[in-house]
């Protein structure tokens, strides 16, 4: 082998010059051997000089290249998914909300701490809607903050091998009263305040929500009155139905303090969590929310709405502007991915449908108590759950056909698939749907995967899907999903008949 090549390849492991420069040993003839010889083991160079040996290993060009590649490959893979946007313009929008410019000496605020984070949008949204209702009913301004996926003090975190924003402004998703939006249903809009200011007349009491940064500026820590959700047992009484629980909270807050800067901490006792939203207790909450601006004035953010308008601009809407539905369209929610394990967990513990998915008037039901555990095997129960939670292609096609046949007067012929499923699976499903007579909502747009969205819109694609599903003549949801439950709630709040909501 060429000497230069040998040195480049193995120079870090062996110094070639040391093989040539060792000293000559003395002749055995001049040595006087000892009478009692102890045979010692040969010296171990690595044991004597481990740091030197390690340094030689690490100085190898080949090893350095391998380490560099090993470090760069995962970084390049993560970066290939793109750098998430900062949404700085929306942060600025929230900072400059007009209600932040008015001092309002009689204004009272309600801030909740220890709330949910690290969960999907719809889990967070369920909680935020209820908390903003409590603030509204208590005649206080709700204090909202960012949607938080991670508490890391960094702009991004890793999720599924890609970068994801740790925080996002709530107004990337919604521009409703919960996120500081106007309340036109009770004439609480910026136009009303501007007119009052110009005329010199009295302004209405402003209870529009404010951002946390504004609350921090007007309510220093020393001025805040702090309460705990664990202060009274009735605040988390499981025997109360949803409406009674909300009324209990409003009554407690009204009696607790008149101070303008009120903070409630959920750290010691979570109340509005998955256990509540998974139960039928939330059904009695709906009329309260629907009668207030919290739902009556709910709307998606301009970022969500612009994506919907761009993707649906060629689609004809119903003549009924109030309902704003797309005639003949069925939107179906097909959750995949982590639901493979989640659905098996639901079957194992016989979990019922989510609360809002059990709303009276939804004809499709699942009652775990209907199972006879003595005569039906665990595999039979699992199969039944999977049919409704994680149906295969044949089961989906059959279910859509059933819904179409049950409502011939609606002329259901178009389908939109809300799904996080793999593209190959969605393509196979669509081939079977076409054979069964279905057409896409728009040419070339069959599912979430076909949406034309920007980098900013990519991280709110679930909300875009929900806004599209709200406009479907019929929605088929997943009974175990909070996303499906929220779609049903928003559809009902818009005046869409409850019977137009079906389940897999």
Swiss-Prot record:
Coiled coil: none annotated. Keywords: Carbohydrate metabolism, Fucose metabolism, Glycoprotein, Glycosyltransferase, Membrane, Transferase, Transmembrane, Transmembrane helix. InterPro entries: GDP-Fuc_O-FucTrfase (IPR019378). GO terms for molecular function: glycosyltransferase activity. Pathway: Mycotoxin biosynthesis. The keyword NADP does not apply. Its main location: membrane. The chain crosses the membrane at residues 66-86. GO terms for biological process: fucose metabolic process. It comes from the Eukaryota. One of its GO terms (cellular component) is membrane. The structure of strobilurin A was used for the development of the major class of beta-methoxyacrylate agricultural fungicides since its beta-methoxyacrylate toxophore targets the Qo site of complex III of the mitochondrial electron transport chain and prevents adenosine triphosphate synthesis. Compounds such as azoxystrobin (Syngenta) and Kresoxim methyl (BASF) are among the most widely used fungicides worldwide. This class of antifungals are used as effective treatments against a broad range of destructive fungal plant pathogens and make significant contributions to food security. It is found in: Membrane. It is a single-pass membrane protein. Part of the gene cluster that mediates the biosynthesis of strobilurin A, an antifungal polyketide that contains a key beta-methoxyacrylate toxophore that targets the complex III of the mitochondrial electron transport chain. Strobilurin biosynthesis begins with construction of benzoyl CoA by step-wise elimination of ammonia from phenylalanine by the phenylalanine ammonia-lyase str11, oxygenation by str8 and retro-Claisen reaction to form benzoic acid, which is activated to its CoA thiolester benzoyl CoA by the dedicated CoA ligase str10. This is Strobilurin A biosynthesis cluster protein l1. It comes from Strobilurus tenacellus.
């Amino acid at each position: 082998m060429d000497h230069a090549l040998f040195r480049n390849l193995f120079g870090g492991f062996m110094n070639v010059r040391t093989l040539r420069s060792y000293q000559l040993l003395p002749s055995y003839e001049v040595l006087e051997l000892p009478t009692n010889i102890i045979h010692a083991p040969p010296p171990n160079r690595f044991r004597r000089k481990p740091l030197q040996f390690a340094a030689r290993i690490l100085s190898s060009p080949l090893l350095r290249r391998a380490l560099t590649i090993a470090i760069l490959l995962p970084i390049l893979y993560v970066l290939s998914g793109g750098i998430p946007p900062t949404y700085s313009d929306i942060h600025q929008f929230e900072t400059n909300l007009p209600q932040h410019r008015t001092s309002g000496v009689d204004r009272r605020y309600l801030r909740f701490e220890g709330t949910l984070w690290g969960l999907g949008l719809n889990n967070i949204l369920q909680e935020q809607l209820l908390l903003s209702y409590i603030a509204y009913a208590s005649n206080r301004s709700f204090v909202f903050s960012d949607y938080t996926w991670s508490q890391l003090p960094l702009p991004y975190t890793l999720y599924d091998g890609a970068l994801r924003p740790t925080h996002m402004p709530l107004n990337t998703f919604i521009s409703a009263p919960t996120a500081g939006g106007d309340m036109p249903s009770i004439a609480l809009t910026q136009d009303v305040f501007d007119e009052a200011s110009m005329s010199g007349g009295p302004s209405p009491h402003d209870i529009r929500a404010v951002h946390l940064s504004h609350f921090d500026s007007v309510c220093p820590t020393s001025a805040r009155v702090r309460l705990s959700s664990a202060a009274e047992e009735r605040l988390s009484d499981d025997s109360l139905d949803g409406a009674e629980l909300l009324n209990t909270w409003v009554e407690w807050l009204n009696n607790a303090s008149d101070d303008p800067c009120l903070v409630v901490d959920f750290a010691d006792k979570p109340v509005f969590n998955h256990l509540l939203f998974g139960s039928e207790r939330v059904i009695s909450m709906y009329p309260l929310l629907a009668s207030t601006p919290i739902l009556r004035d709910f709307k998606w953010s301009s970022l969500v709405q612009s994506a919907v308008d761009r993707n649906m601009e060629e689609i004809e809407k119903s003549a009924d502007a109030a309902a704003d539905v797309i005639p003949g369209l069925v939107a179906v929610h097909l959750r995949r991915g982590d639901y493979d394990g989640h659905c098996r967990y639901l079957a194992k513990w016989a979990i019922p449908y989510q609360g809002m998915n059990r709303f009276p008037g939804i004809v499709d039901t699942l009652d775990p108590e209907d199972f006879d555990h003595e005569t039906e095997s665990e595999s039979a129960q699992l199969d039944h759950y999977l049919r409704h939670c994680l149906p295969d292609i044949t089961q989906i096609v059959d279910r859509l056909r059933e819904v179409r046949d049950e409502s011939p007067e609606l002329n259901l012929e178009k389908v939109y698939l809300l799904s996080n499923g793999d593209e190959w699976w969605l393509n196979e499903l669509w081939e079977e749907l076409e054979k069964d007579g279905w057409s896409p909502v728009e040419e070339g747009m069959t599912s979430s995967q076909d949406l034309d969205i920007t980098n900013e819109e990519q991280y709110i694609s679930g909300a875009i899907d929900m806004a599209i599903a709200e406009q479907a003549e019929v929605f088929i949801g997943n009974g175990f999903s909070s996303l499906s439950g929220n779609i049903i709630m928003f559809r009902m709040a818009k005046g869409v008949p409850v019977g137009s909501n079906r389940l897999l």
